[in-house]
């Protein structure tokens, strides 16, 4: 008897379980977030989704720095810029924590001065306004990302309901 090759016509694996009601209801929001640019997606996933992926962290820092650099004075010393770069991720963390918790307390200027290895007076004269501006850049990213998500979501609802 010669063996005959026959291809299986069905898979022996179990079928995938159907989507839960929550996943189904949540999918339009997920599509809205996925339609954003990389930095906005990264911010929403980090701040509101708890995703700590390094690629998200770098995308957020690059977006915040470019937004901040566009609004900061052009005549900033190279040494100051180098120290400011070290504050970008800290400003992201501070704004994210403030968004999540009402009891969040801002870091004191003396603490931030110690992190940069500068005196408190130097912090107040040189770095404090930059710190405020950097946090404003993060808040602007937050607002733009949330509004863009809402806009995409509403457009999706309009398309579905029409």
Name what the model sees in each region:
Residues 1-42, 46-76, 105-122, 128-162:
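N-terminal interaction/assembly modules
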Residues 45-46, 53-54, 78-107:
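Short, amphipathic alpha-helical "recognition" segments used to contact nucleic acids or chromatin
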